[in-house]
Amino acid sequence: MFGAFVSHRLWSDSGCTTTCITNSIANYVAFGEQIGFPFKSAQVFIAGPRKAVINIQEDDKVELLKMIVKHNLWVVAHGTYLDVPWSRRSAFVTHFIQQELLICKEVGIKGLVLHLGAVEPELIVEGLKKIKPVEGVVIYLETPHNKHHTYKYSTMEQIKELFLRIRNTRLKQIGLCIDTAHIWSSGVNISSYNDAGQWLRSLENIHSVIPPSHIMFHLNDAATECGSGIDRHASLFEGMIWKSYSHKIKQSGLYCFVEYITRHQCPAILERNLGSSMQLQTALTAEFTTLKSLLK
């Protein structure tokens, strides 16, 4: 279930004006076939990202659904950076998130990723209760990156506490998005196979609370030190999490994550947004070649 973030800025044909998301996905699928790594998943923006504006047009909706069905892709949308239903602007935000969820349903997108805030679980649950569930579309709560806040949602104790509240409140269609760069930035050492294995075994121990069917990953290395609180992604084995394992990749924490993802068939997205299409495709070619070797 491996794939990447598909930015229409970097993936669509120049001059594209109407069906740019579909065009981007078509080029992305062709690229995967070209490098010998057929993609099973993708992540897109259908709104924003920095403004509460829907940016998928009606023609694009029709063609995107056809594209997703044709290639049997699992696609998730990333919410805008304003999608914080536990904020003081929650009435407007909740309405906008509802629009995004309905569009996801319409075009065959399986989920919407929302950034978790560094706030108490009860506030998050109260915010989620304001959103009407949309059948077939999961809201994935993404692990945040922070250094000083009490609630980081990078430890299994805090993740379990949050999802127990979600389950006990009978909220439906809520999942977890684990960003490896974010949990590293929040102070979790996942560098070695053993370190990552310890964290992932703890995750497996709470599958009764948050099942793997509702877990996805943002598979990113990090350009900053463990516990920095800074969100800066890097290509796999090029950042501070796993670079020291670039010549012994099966001893790395990344290999342990790949094993978990494969064992439980979780979607995993590489989030790269480099300066040019050529830079992006060069980086992704190297990363997916490495992933292919880990999957053997």
From Swiss-Prot:
Gene Ontology CC, one term: virion component
Q: Does the keyword DNA repair apply?
A: yes
Q: Where in the cell is it found?
A: Host nucleus; Host cytoplasm; Virion
Expression induction? Expressed in the early phase of the viral replicative cycle and accumulates at later times.
Cofactor annotation:
Zn(2+)
Write down how the cofactor binds this protein: Binds 3 Zn(2+) ions.
Residues annotated as binding Zn(2+) 1 are H78, E271
The cross-references to InterPro entries, in alphabetical order and at most eight, read:
AP_endonuc_2, AP_endonuc_F2_Zn_BS, Xyl_isomerase-like_sf, Xyl_isomerase-like_TIM-brl
Superkingdom of the organism of origin: Viruses
Name the Enzyme Commission number(s) assigned to this protein.
3.1.21.-
UniProt key word Acyltransferase: no
Q: Which GO terms describe its biological process?
A: base-excision repair
- Residues where Zn(2+) 2 binds: H115, E142, H218
- What is one Pfam family matched by this protein? AP_endonuc_2
The set of disulfide-linked cysteines is C16-C20
Sorted alphabetically, which keywords does the UniProt record give?
Answer: Disulfide bond, DNA damage, DNA repair, Early protein, Endonuclease, Exonuclease, Host cytoplasm, Host nucleus, Hydrolase, Metal-binding, Nuclease, Virion, Zinc
The top EC class is hydrolase
Segments spanning the bilayer are: none
The role this protein plays is: Endonuclease that plays a role in DNA repair. Cleaves phosphodiester bonds on the 5' side of apurinic or apyrimidinic sites (AP sites). In addition to endonuclease activity, the ASFV enzyme has a proofreading 3'-5' exonuclease activity that is considerably more efficient in the elimination of a mismatch than in that of a correctly paired base. Displays 3'-phosphatase and 3'-repair diesterase activities. The single nucleotide gaps generated by the AP endonuclease are filled by the viral AP endonuclease and DNA ligase.
The misc remark on file is:
Consistent with its intracellular location, ASFV encodes its own replicative DNA polymerase and three base excision repair enzymes: a class II AP endonuclease, the repair polymerase Pol X, and an ATP-dependent DNA ligase.
What is the official name of this protein in its record? Probable AP endonuclease
Query: What organism is listed for this UniProt entry?
Result: African swine fever virus (isolate Tick/South Africa/Pretoriuskop Pr4/1996) (ASFV)
